[in-house]
Amino acid sequence: MNPPTWLRGRLGVLLSLGPACAVETLPGVPGLLLAPVGLWLLFAAPVLLLRGFTDKVVSTRSGSLLLAAGLAVLLDILVALGVNTVLPLLGVERPLTRLVLASATTLVLLVLGILAPQSRRPLLRGAPLSGARPVAWAAAGALLLSVAGPIRLNNGLGGAVSTTALVVVTALIVLLLLRHARCSPMVLEAGIYAASATLLLLTSLRGWYITGHDIQREYLYFRLTLGGGFWDISAYTDPYNACLSITLLPVSIFRLTGIEDIYVFKAVLPLLFALTPVLVHRAVRNVASPLVALLSAVFFMAFPTFFTDMPFLGRQAIAFLLLACAMLVLTDSRRPLPLRRTVFTVLLAGVVLSHYSTIYVIVGTLATAFAVDKAWRLASRPGRARAHRAVGQGRTRTFLTWWTVAVPAVLALLWAGPLTHTGGQLESTLRVVASDLFGSGDARGGSSDTRYSLFGGAGVTPEERLAEYREDTIGYTRADRADGKYLPLDALAKYPTPVAEKENLPLTPAGRALDTVGLSVPALNGVLRQAAALLLQVLVLVGFVIALRGRKSPFTPVRDQITLTVGALAMMGLFTLVPQLSVDYSVLRAFQQGLLFFAPFIAAGALWAVRRAGRRAVPVLCVLVAGLLLDLTGAVPKALGGYPAQLALSNSGPAYDIYYPHAEDRRAAMWLNQRAAGDDLVVQTDRYSFSRLQTLFTVRTQDSVHPALLRSQSYVLLGSTPTRKDEVTVFFRGDLVTYRYPRDLLDTTRNLIYSNEGAVVYR
């Protein structure tokens, strides 16, 4: 008798593990073979073996696969952490090698294959694929352009291909909206993934080296772990080093797949994060119509932080992936509640290991939601019946309980405290927050990102922020300045540092045509961005109100979605009103995280707004979504001009100036590192040149060249942007400020000892 199909598939996975492990342990295996084998061991095989378990946690086929993918990522982290913890006790000094990781992964998968329940659901057979052909063509075109566009820009060519990719992504999303009733869920989710991956890759693939902000430091700690073959938090007690999503996980991927290390960060991690909008869709689809679920995923992708910041935040990307898996578990009420609560808590434990700030915000959100739920129940009148549809689809038993809140909180405190000793930033933030709340602080404003909030103020001007920065630097260098370690203030008075003018793209023919009729294109672009930010917030509130009323809501949220949305909005309000929180954790990133909870309310608000269009409601919605996407992704400003260039579309603009790595900078850094190796002088460079070059320096380095911080004796390296444009950017209290740099100060007080027509070094 032939075994059933599900057993044959499971047996095939188990039989593949031995040959895969053998390939990993053989020397000289070509990368074309090593990469698919490593990806199989790390992701594909765990997903297939975990399906039987995830089938018991969530009820849908795609939901089971998505949850298995999130658990596979968490499993990879835990396997690497396990060998890193246990093997040194047995005398193995370098446990993070390919041999050890491949053997441990294979052993864990064998145990998983034997002990885990077996899935009786076919993987793909019988899955409906209605509407697949047009979606497949649009998705393939978008993904192809997402790679071709950055390559052209990296080679010094124009951004037309990348702009076309944004147009194709928008067309793909409009196609999904128009055909959502005729497309199967699998086709919709494949289209969402293609759109998500395209938006992320257009940014993440920029530059031939590591490009971005936080990713530079993430890559540094990854390299330190990789070089030592061992993760040791005591060697570098830094919160970044405590994020296993950017240390152990990338090391496992690099070791087992042979993918070049920079592309682990530039491609593999973004492609994993691209699953998050799909998870948003699947989670919302458990409680809402296909249109509401699709819109929720679209609004999550359309928020600018998704495609401008998240490609440079590997640790937060993995944390968001696991949090989205947790929301999938929360909204699928067709499976046993105790099991779902346990898996939810395990996923949040994975967030603890992945990113410190994300789990702190989650704990605050959960605690607020739990309190709101208790207050809601106390305020409800027993036996009171509602005349219309009940919020929560009649299910009154809530998902959140005291231990689903307490366990992640305790784990976060343990991880940041006695286990890694990296909680100093949290303690510092809480002290400043307490000072702000009780009126003993310096009363300075928070990040200017709060100006996008409905409840935010006007923000701080660049001139005011730069003056604060200069005042701070003079204050904490006063004693050393008196000892002659820094240049005297009277000498600095001759060299002002005015704020640089904002550089916009030149007006295109279309932009000039608008300008001739009296319409200011720069003002129009600014108004559109501000209006988009306010629109999303208004839609959240509108959707929330109509969901509570129940009658006209396009979807009926479960009770926990309502309380979690209250918690997320409360955290947003706290970040807006308490300055230090907006400085230490971006308000825009907090909103992106909040979208995992309240995206369906935005969708409900949008559907309510177009309800009077009747049969034309979906086409009107398509126009609204297309306009929002084209504007926020930068396609409209690129077509009109009059707005700062975006990194994904141009070789200019503020992001390009401070994040893009140049070969000239690297050559200057390597030369200076050799020159200063035997010298006692510190190397000074600006913050963003240091960020791009920190993996090359082994000498003492200071990441500021502001005149008030220039030492009397030091090396000074000016990167490409300060050299070519005489501009330097600082990041202070949550804001980027670019000022004109007085190069004549260096020409007067120092000697030029190196120049390569892109970067210079003074002594």
What are these regions (language model features)?
Residues 427-498, 502, 520-522, 551-554, ...:
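Extracytoplasmic
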Residues 323-340:
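Membrane-interface transmembrane helices that cradle and orient dolichyl/undecaprenyl
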Residues 329, 341-359:
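Membrane-interface alpha helices of multi-pass inner-membrane proteins
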Residues 38, 157, 176-190, 194-321, ...:
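Active-site lumenal/periplasmic loops and adjacent helix-entry segments of GT-C-fold
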Residues 178-181, 337-338, 380-399, 511, ...:
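Membrane-interface helix-loop-helix junctions at transmembrane boundaries of multi-pass membrane enzymes
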Residues 1-185, 580:
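Membrane-embedded, hydrophobic transmembrane alpha-helices
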Residues 39, 43, 161-168, 316, ...:
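Hydrophobic/aromatic-rich transmembrane helices and adjacent perimembrane loops
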Residues 13-21, 189-197, 536-541, 549-579, ...:
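Transmembrane alpha-helix segments characteristic
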